[in-house]
Amino acid sequence: MIRVMTDNAANLPPELREQYGIRELCLTYTVNGVPADMSAPFDGYAYYEAMRKGAEVKTSMISPLTAREAMEPVLEQGDDVLYIGLSGGVSGTCWGVSVVAQELRERYPHRDIRVLDSRGASLGEGLVVLEAAHLAQQGADMDTIIARASELCGKMRQLFVVDDLKFLRKGGRLSGAAALAGTLLQIKPILEGDPEGKIVVHSKERGRKKAMEQLIRLYQELVEDKSRPVGISHAAAPAEALHLATELRQAGCTGEILSVCHEPVTGAHVGPGMLALYFYSASWR
């Protein structure tokens, strides 16, 4: 049996993880120096409101011990492991898990242990994980699952609108001068995950409304199959997420739309008010 694992950056709701038997490993974070309780449900409103008021958030990768303690019991039971993780373009988590996986291969030479960098975050990662877990439940072999997941990673589009440029500046994404100018001019950058899974600026729009309209235009322009699943994540902006879902339906989307509050790990770098859209285009990376 193949056990699919991922991290909390994949933004998958508990009920979906349970349905597909997905094990979640946690990147951790602190708010004003206080460690978050990773066993408690994530209160997105409180988290992003704290950020809006100036709270300092720091995030940490999955520890080697956490990865080892998650994988080893599965291997001891005679099962194989596929870990699909947060983009190596924004985190060293996949690299760290890969190191642990290599150690475990030496201890369990008859088990198949794979690590796949999704080059995504939130549902840009999570939608791929769901597809892989579905294939595992159907009895597909590891090579088949890896091939399909890799193909989907190469098709995934991840487009973000941020509300305040200061969080990008703090994360080193923009210079202080550019962030100040953007704020004064009400410029709302649309970000995307590039071929390496790094966050880059796709385009810039004057005002929030025009930026959201551009998300829909990009969906219509780039989507490969409008019946495929689509993801939406928001950083405490549920009304806008609902509006985006409505606009997607009007644009012809017939696939399932999964909408979630954006997880705290990458949310720390894009800030409150962020709105993101995830969908499959033709293969591009």
Predicted regions: what they are:
Residues 3, 9-23, 28-30, 90-93, ...:
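Mixed-charge interfacial surface used for oligomerization/domain docking
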Residues 1, 77-80, 253:
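Short loop/turn motifs at secondary-structure junctions
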Residues 52-99, 142, 146:
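Glycine-rich phosphate- or other oxyanion-binding loops that anchor nucleotides, phosphorylated ligands
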Residues 85, 114-115:
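A glycine-rich beta-strand to alpha-helix segment
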Residues 3-66:
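N-terminal glycine-rich anion-binding loop in soluble enzyme alpha/beta folds
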